[in-house]
């Protein structure tokens, strides 16, 4: 048996200023599954995390609520911890960045960087709120857009026209905190000399530490030249003061990743077998993995490894990046009830339903994952209840009634047993590579074979025949052993189901190696239902509970009000029904969206319309600067528009969007349940 690996695993630190939602849970469930698999295999795997508990946003929210920042982060940490525990995310330690371990490590790393010449200082001119006595980040400044004249826009970009600009370009600026007119003021800032580590980062990011798509994105930043990173903020600020610099604080993103180290150090104080230096020293042989979302890639793949290198610590073995979560093909929405908090989900549904669904769709890539609620119900009910649990419920009763609960020693189908054994390494390989979707497909294929074999043998029919009792017991004992195999393979995903199954099977906690064994002449405990079906009414109740209170907006909307859109673009001349009916509108799935070289406004869309593929060039680039966000989304497509030859290729139709143009282009999407190829009537 190979020597046990030493592994330290982290997930990104949730910000201590709000509740956990299902988008967050994607990452923690993904990480927890991988960690549970490692532990089930016998490896020493430690999983740590913490609340990210510093920054102006926390300071200002606490002030607004009339409490201290310390009280706020304590309340939020308790809420986060309860949500994670109830979703069966089993951290070895869940800490806070506002802790003495983190203060000491942040100061030590900063001082090492400073003493090695990797810290620079210079004066920075910023807006200052004279009433609050604080410098203002861009998001705390509002005013009139210098490009289009739209009012109430943020200090760095306009949500109306999409323009970006410097805060000093904003017209009529005001503090979003106090409403005061800000003044320009100089302040000394501290910068981490990231360019000092450019050569190291170019090598490290191409050494197998990142997925290829992530490494390619990082290469774009590296090729564009690295800039020094501002790591300081001025008082008042909730965080750690910079050593020897009164009134200057570490920017939250400096001490946040150090929180991984601090949480582990806090755990080491309670677990003597863990040696902090053995995991974090420069020549450590232990493995270190960070699981993160694609929105924080630059911090974890540029700033963080450079800080570690400069301070004399080891760098991560790998940074595993996942995509965003959509619900029913769209961004989560409070008005649609699809912005679902973890606690709201838990109030209505079993956490293992979501753990399995996420696992079934997760791959090792960075693609976004869609939580399609209709598919969610179907997959859980079919796979977990209809396939896995069904095996035990089919067989257990015959063993209890016919043999007092004692499983006989039986292997009536050696070929099927061998198929389960042969599949184990492939399933393990998929878990190891974070290709959980492939692992679930392999497991469900085995469940299908087990159910088909039991259905073919039909013990319920044999049980009615004279002299067939021995055969019935052999079939059902073998069926229970196949069920046990599936439980072993699913245990990282479904720990509660595994615990309940272990109680029914009357066995110790199952390890991965147990898949090689069969229970023989073994007593079972009484069988009770291990999992129930999802009722669609529970999904509906969860959605309703997630919806914002829109009563005020609805009452406002009830009064007839014009918005000027018909003035901007008057109604077209009337047409008859036949003219409209000649247009063939179809539902299309956007399989791929990409930039078109040499085109300022176009995106190339590859559409799935059910039984065919279509290529469309669409002038929506200004509204969708990240084309990949469109992939997996349903839209409306004019299917019988004559193909148009363009210099970039052939455009086979048109997708539908609303809006005047520029950043105000809104691609149309059908309601949930629509399928590619369906005609719009």
Swiss-Prot record:
It comes from Azotobacter vinelandii (strain DJ / ATCC BAA-1303). PANTHER family: METHIONINE--TRNA LIGASE, METHIONINE--TRNA LIGASE, CYTOPLASMIC. It comes from the Bacteria. It is found in: Cytoplasm. Belongs to the class-I aminoacyl-tRNA synthetase family. MetG type 1 subfamily. Disulfide bonds: none annotated. Zn(2+) binds at residues 145, 148, 158, 161. ATP binds at residue 334. Is required not only for elongation of protein synthesis but also for the initiation of all mRNA translation through initiator tRNA(fMet) aminoacylation. The gene is metG. Its cofactor is Zn(2+). HAMAP family: Met_tRNA_synth_type1 (MF_00098). A motif ('HIGH' region) lies at residues 14-24. GO terms for molecular function: ATP binding; metal ion binding; methionine-tRNA ligase activity; tRNA binding. Binds 1 zinc ion per subunit. SUPFAM superfamilies: Anticodon-binding domain of a subclass of class I aminoacyl-tRNA synthetases, Methionyl-tRNA synthetase (MetRS), Zn-domain, Nucleic acid-binding proteins, Nucleotidylyl transferase. This is Methionine--tRNA ligase. One of its GO terms (biological process) is methionyl-tRNA aminoacylation. Homodimer. Its main location: cytoplasm. GO terms for cellular component: cytosol. Its EC number is 6.1.1.10.
């Amino acid at each position: 048996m190979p020597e046990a690996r030493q592994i330290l695993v982290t997930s990104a630190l949730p910000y201590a200023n709000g509740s956990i939602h299902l988008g967050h849970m994607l990452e923690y469930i993904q990480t927890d599954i991988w960690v549970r698999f490692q532990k089930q295999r016998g490896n020493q795997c430690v999983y740590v995390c913490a609340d990210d508990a510093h920054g102006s946003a926390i300071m200002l929210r606490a002030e607004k609520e009339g409490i201290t920042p310390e009280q706020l982060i304590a309340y939020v940490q308790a809420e986060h911890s309860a949500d994670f525990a109830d979703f069966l995310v089993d951290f070895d330690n869940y800490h806070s960045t506002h802790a003495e371990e983190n203060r000491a490590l942040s100061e030590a790393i900063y001082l090492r960087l400073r003493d090695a010449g990797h810290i620079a200082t210079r004066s920075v001119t910023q807006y200052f709120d004279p009433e609050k006595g604080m410098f203002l980040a861009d998001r705390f400044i509002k005013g009139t857009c210098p490009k289009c004249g739209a009012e109430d826009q943020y200090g760095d970009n306009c949500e109306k026209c999409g323009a970006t600009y410097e805060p000093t370009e904003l017209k009529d600026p005001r503090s979003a905190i106090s409403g005061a007119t800000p003044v320009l003021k100089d302040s000394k800032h501290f910068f981490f000399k990231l360019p000092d580590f450019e050569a190291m980062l170019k090598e490290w990011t191409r050494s197998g530490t990142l997925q290829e798509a992530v490494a390619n994105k990082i290469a774009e930043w590296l090729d564009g030249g690295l800039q020094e990173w501002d790591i300081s903020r001025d008082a008042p600020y909730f965080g750690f003061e910079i050593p020897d610099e009164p009134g200057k604080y570490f920017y939250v993103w400096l001490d946040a990743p150090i929180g991984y180290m601090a949480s582990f150090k806090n755990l080491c104080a309670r677990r003597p077998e863990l040696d902090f230096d053995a995991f974090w020293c420069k020549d450590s042989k232990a493995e270190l993995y960070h699981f993160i979302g694609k929105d924080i890639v630059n911090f974890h793949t540029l700033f963080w490894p450079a800080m570690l290198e400069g301070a004399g610590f080891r760098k991560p073995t790998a940074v595993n990046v996942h995509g965003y979560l959509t619900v029913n093909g769209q961004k989560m929405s409070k008005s649609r009830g699809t912005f679902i908090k973890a606690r709201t989900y838990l109030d209505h549904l079993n956490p293992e339903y979501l753990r399995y669904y996420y696992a079934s769709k997760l791959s090792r890539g960075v693609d976004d994952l869609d939580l399609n609620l209709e598919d969610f119900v179907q997959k859980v009910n079919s796979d977990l209840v209809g396939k896995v649990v069904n095996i035990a419920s089919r067989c257990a009763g015959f063993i209890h009634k016919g043999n007092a609960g004692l499983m006989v020693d039986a292997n009536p189908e050696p070929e099927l047993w061998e198929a389960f054994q042969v599949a184990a390494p492939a399933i393990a390989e998929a878990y190891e590579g974070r290709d959980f979707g492939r692992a679930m497909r392999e497991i469900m294929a085995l469940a299908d074979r087990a159910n088909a074999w039991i259905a073919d043998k039909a013990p319920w029919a044999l049980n009615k025949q004279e002299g067939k009792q021995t055969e019935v017991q052999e079939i059902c004992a073998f069926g229970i052993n196949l069920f046990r195999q599936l439980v072993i393979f699913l245990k990282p995903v479904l720990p509660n189901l595994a615990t309940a199954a272990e109680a029914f099977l009357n066995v110790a906690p199952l390890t991965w190696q147990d898949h090689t064994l069969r229970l023989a002449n073994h007593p079972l405990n009484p069988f009770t239902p291990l999992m129930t079906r999802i009722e669609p009414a529970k999904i509906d109740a969860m959605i309703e509970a997630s919806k914002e209170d829109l009563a005020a907006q609805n009452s406002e909307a009830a009064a007839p009000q014009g918005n000027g859109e018909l003035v901007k673009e008057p109604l077209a001349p009337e047409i008859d029904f036949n003219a409209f009916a000649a247009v063939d509108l179809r539902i299309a799935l956007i399989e791929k969206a990409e930039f078109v070289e040499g085109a300022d406004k176009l995106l190339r869309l590859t559409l799935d319309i059910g039984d065919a593929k279509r290529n469309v060039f669409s002038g929506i680039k200004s509204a969708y600067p990240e084309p990949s966000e469109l992939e997996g989304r349903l839209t409306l497509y004019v299917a019988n528009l004559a193909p148009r030859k363009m210099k970039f290729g052939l455009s086979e139709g048109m997708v539908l969007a609303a809006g005047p143009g520029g950043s105000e282009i809104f691609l149309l999407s059908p309601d949930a349940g629509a399928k590619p190829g369906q005609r719009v009537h």
